[in-house]
């Protein structure tokens, strides 16, 4: 598995990321916010996302949202392809997103916004308060 800072070469994955988020929201019957491919592309183009790939196959994704002139940074849109769930990859993606956020936005307060119990547990184990 490769955990990468998403860049323009990863734009081709925007549709599958958007579809995977939509599928997960429907399957779990939760209030997961849908993200359009164009929204995902904007995060990728600005290097504000982590993508996980198995060779060229999409595995997972998480993006960075910025507020208040970079005073605040949130991690959002965490998704893992159903084929790869249960392997601890969501936690690794969140860890990589946290590290990338600290390097890119060193003066920002970092937080996570979620209503999902699994993501809350990951955030807790990573030290989010």
Where are these regions (language model features)?
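Conserved GNAT acetyl-CoA-binding A-motif
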Residues: 101-115
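A short beta-loop-alpha structural element at the N-terminal edge
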Residues: 1-17
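Conserved acetyl-CoA-binding loop of GNAT-fold acetyltransferases
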Residues: 124-129
């Amino acid at each position: 598995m490769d955990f990468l800072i998403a860049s323009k070469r990863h734009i081709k994955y925007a549709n599958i990321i958007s579809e995977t988020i939509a599928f997960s929201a429907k399957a779990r019957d939760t209030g997961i916010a849908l993200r359009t491919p164009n929204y995902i592309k904007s995060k990728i183009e600005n290097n504000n996302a982590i993508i996980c790939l198995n060779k060229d196959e999409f595995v997972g994704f998480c993006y960075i949202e910025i507020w208040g002139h970079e005073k605040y940074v949130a991690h959002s849109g965490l998704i893992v392809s159903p084929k790869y769930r249960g392997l601890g990859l969501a936690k690794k993606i969140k860890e990589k997103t946290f590290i990338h956020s600290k390097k890119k936005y060193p003066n920002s307060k970092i937080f996570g916004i979620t209503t999902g119990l699994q993501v809350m547990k990951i955030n807790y184990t990573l030290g989010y308060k």
